């Protein structure tokens, strides 16, 4: 079975902003590979597969201190995700998808049983795309409930985001997570919410490179500066 890059990046639906899922999907038999490089010599790898025209699944795994002479610190488990689009986008209505993702971002806190940035857990998201002179623009609104509640904060929360194309090869990303599930006494957040932004370059029909600034509002005392991350993405078909 061969994996063949067959789509231009700009023709693919954005499945994710920086962290926030959208209502976008991989095509049937589509393959997505992701590598994220984050602080603490951390690497997070993910594989997603389009099972049919309205659904996809994925797995991910990673860890920190992968380089250097420190003890390797792997995440405690392989994480899973799935997404189904329940409503197709129309001229006046957004696409609507529901899904589940157990993968959070950053290092895993063994005491609180959570990632630095909690996973979205179960979520519903609406996405609407528009064509503008410079390129497409997508608006996204979601609500979610994470199951990483070892800190005692299990509130529902939500997020908003936008992706804007600048020509054929560059996309600017921005998202704001309200962080309502990360503002209790034992939480890592401090109530400001999480604002992330990024820029994504299409390198070829199969590859994209992305640079992200995360937690720009510096939500939480453990974040004196925004996080800088690098992401490499591959798209193909099997």
Positions of predicted regions on the chain:
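Transmembrane beta-barrel domains of Gram-negative outer membranes and organellar outer membranes
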Residues: 7-137, 143-148, 163-171, 175-238
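N-terminal signal peptide c-region/cleavage motif recognized by signal peptidases
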Residues: 3-5
């Amino acid at each position: 079975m061969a994996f063949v890059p067959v789509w231009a990046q700009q023709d693919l639906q954005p499945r994710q902003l920086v962290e926030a899922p959208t209502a976008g999907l991989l095509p049937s038999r589509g393959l997505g590979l992701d590598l994220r490089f984050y602080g603490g010599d951390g690497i997070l790898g993910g594989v997603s597969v389009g099972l049919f025209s309205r659904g996809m699944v994925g797995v991910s795994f990673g860890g920190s201190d992968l380089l250097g002479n420190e003890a390797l610190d792997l995440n405690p488990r392989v994480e899973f995700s799935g997404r189904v689009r329940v409503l197709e986008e129309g001229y006046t209505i957004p696409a609507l998808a529901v899904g589940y993702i157990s993968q959070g971002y950053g290092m895993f806190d063994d005491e609180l049983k959570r990632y630095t940035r909690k996973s979205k857990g179960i979520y519903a998201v609406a996405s609407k795309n528009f064509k503008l002179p410079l390129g497409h623009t997508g608006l996204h609104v979601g609500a979610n409930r994470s199951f990483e509640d070892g800190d005692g904060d299990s509130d529902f929360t939500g997020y908003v985001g936008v992706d804007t194309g600048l020509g054929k090869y560059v996309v600017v990303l921005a998202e704001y997570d309200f962080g309502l599930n990360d503002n209790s006494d034992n939480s890592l957040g401090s109530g400001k919410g999480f604002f992330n932004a990024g820029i994504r370059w299409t390198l070829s029909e199969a590859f994209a490179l992305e640079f992200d600034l995360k937690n720009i509002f510096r939500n939480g005392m453990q974040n004196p500066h925004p996080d800088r991350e690098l992401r490499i993405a591959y798209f193909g078909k099997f």
